[in-house]
């Protein structure tokens, strides 16, 4: 029995020359939790070429969505960036990962801290009704280099608040903090700096991030993961995992897969 489903590409969106997303069909047997990743890829010379990708779509949706960087000499993304509607993609049957609400202790606010394509799992998490049932406020922070790399910005700010089922909760509970490092923008600087200086809390008018009330999910570059882990621990937050819930969780399975 194969470890993969073969899916068909339904749409492709190129955000920039370095960033694209795509949707595929979804086998009815595929089950996952919001925040999970799975192995996806292409068959090259008859063999599967795979990388770990977070699932950006919610687990109740009939299609799958993925967000990817383009690396010209990357074994997979150099090929994946050229996919077109109707092409075949292979998708692993066993999604997994640590960015699940179940791996966090109860809290008042949920911070979702992402850089680059680390946003993908949080697009799934912010479309989960349970997220808003368990936390009073959900704070999505996305750090990129250039404004055009703020994938899903318009969807988050304009479409999600009108969502048929989640719109009211999202309008009242979701706070979005996009930040850019290489261009003038309303929020500038690295995510790590914004956390360290309590810049986010000030801008969103919430208390400084603290162990008593806040829970955190982190997904991004290895440097960002390392720095934020140290900052969380300095503030007294304890890391959780698949066996022991904690105050923050980190996805280490991949760092911008190529």
Q: In which residue ranges do the predicted regions lie?
A:
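A short, basic/flexible loop-to-alpha-helix module at the beginning of a structural domain
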Residues: 95-105
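Histidine-anchored nucleotide/phosphate-binding helix
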Residues: 121-133
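Ser/Thr-glycine-rich phosphate-binding loops at phosphate-binding pockets of nucleotides
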Residues: 115-121
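Reductase modules of NAD(P)H-dependent flavoproteins
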Residues: 2-3, 141, 148-258
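Short, conserved phosphate/pyrophosphate- and ester-handling motifs at nucleotide-, phospho-/glycolipid
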Residues: 35, 118, 221
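Generic structural signal for buried aliphatic residues
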Residues: 38, 89-92
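Conserved beta-strand elements of the Class I
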Residues: 110-113, 217
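Ferredoxin-reductase
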Residues: 2-85
């Amino acid at each position: 029995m194969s470890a993969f489903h073969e899916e068909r590409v339904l749409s492709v969106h190129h955000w920039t020359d370095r960033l694209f997303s795509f949707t595929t069909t979804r086998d009815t047997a595929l089950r996952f939790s919001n925040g999970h990743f799975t192995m996806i890829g292409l068959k090259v010379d008859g063999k599967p070429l795979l990388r770990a990708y977070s699932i950006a779509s919610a687990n109740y949706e009939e299609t799958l969505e993925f967000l990817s960087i383009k690396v010209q000499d990357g074994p997979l993304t150099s090929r994946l960036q050229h996919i077109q509607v109707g092409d075949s993609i292979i998708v692993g049957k066993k999604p997994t990962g640590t960015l699940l609400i179940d791996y966090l202790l109860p809290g008042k606010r949920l911070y979702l801290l992402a850089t680059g394509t680390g946003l993908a799992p949080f697009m799934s998490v912010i479309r989960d009704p349970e997220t808003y049932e368990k936390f009073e406020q959900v704070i999505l922070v996305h750090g990129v280099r250039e404004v055009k790399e703020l994938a899903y910005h318009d969807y988050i700010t304009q479409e999600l608040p009108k969502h048929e089922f989640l719109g009211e909760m999202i309008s009242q509970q979701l706070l979005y903090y996009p930040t850019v490092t290489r261009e003038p923008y309303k929020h500038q600087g690295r995510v790590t700096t914004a956390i360290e200086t309590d810049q986010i809390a000030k801008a969103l008018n919430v208390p400084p991030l603290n162990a008593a009330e806040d829970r955190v999910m982190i997904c991004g570059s290895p440097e960002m993961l390392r720095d934020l882990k140290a900052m969380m621990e300095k503030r007294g937050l304890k890391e959780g995992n698949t066996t022991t819930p904690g105050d923050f969780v980190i996805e280490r399975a991949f760092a911008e897969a190529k």
